[in-house]
């Protein structure tokens, strides 16, 4: 089982309050563990403020200031000082990984210099930190019914209002959120 390019959707009975109602985009999943980014947990800082704090100046003069008001996301509890940008592929940056034709993840600082300009990716989210699992840990959580999984949809990441992302991810499974029980168990 490889869940790269899938969503982890928290079950209603998720015991860990940090991940309640979270949707996590899985960037990597292999025998060593898994790594992903929460896509529905905005924090109280905008992209523009974050760029000011890390002292990054745009390299292109044509500013697109509306994108600087986007929220930054809490990607997860690991390495919260590290930034990750999920975006629609446009240019290649120093450290980018194209996950699909419609989703890339970049960790290099060069992408920050184009945010807020005409040269920025058409859609993106900035996350600080990531969610990580050691070997076998995610599989154990899946066996405990902590998560649902579904193939990732870029429209949920980039175009769905933040408050609707969990519900839309559940709907991709062909069910309504009200059909989910907050009680875990096995038949």
UniProtKB/Swiss-Prot annotation:
One of its GO terms (cellular component) is cytosol. Disulfide bonds: none annotated. It comes from the Bacteria. Gene3D superfamilies: VC0467-like, VC0467-like domains. Pfam families: DUF179. InterPro entries: AlgH-like. Belongs to the UPF0301 (AlgH) family. HAMAP family: UPF0301. PANTHER family: UNCHARACTERIZED PROTEIN YQGE, UPF0301 PROTEIN YQGE. This is UPF0301 protein VV2869. It comes from Vibrio vulnificus (strain YJ016).
């Amino acid at each position: 089982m490889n869940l790269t390019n899938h969503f982890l959707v928290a079950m209603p009975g998720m015991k860990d309050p940090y991940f309640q109602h979270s949707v996590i985009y899985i960037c990597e999943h292999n025998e060593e563990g898994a790594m992903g980014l929460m896509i529905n947990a905005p924090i109280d800082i905008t992209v523009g403020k974050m760029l000011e704090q890390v002292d990054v100046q745009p390299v292109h003069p044509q500013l697109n200031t509306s994108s600087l008001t986007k929220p930054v996301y809490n990607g997860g509890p690991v390495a919260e000082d590290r930034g990750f940008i999920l975006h629609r592929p446009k240019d290649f940056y120093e450290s980018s990984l194209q996950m699909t034709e419609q989703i890339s993840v970049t960790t290099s600082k060069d992408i920050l210099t184009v945010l807020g300009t005409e040269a920025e990716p058409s859609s993106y989210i900035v996350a600080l930190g990531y969610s990580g699992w050691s070997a076998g840990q995610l599989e154990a959580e899946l066996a405990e019914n902590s998560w649902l999984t579904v193939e990732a949809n870029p429209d949920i990441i980039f175009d769905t209002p933040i408050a609707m992302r969990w519900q839309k991810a559940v709907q991709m499974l062909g069910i309504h959120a009200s059909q989910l029980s907050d009680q875990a168990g096995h038949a």
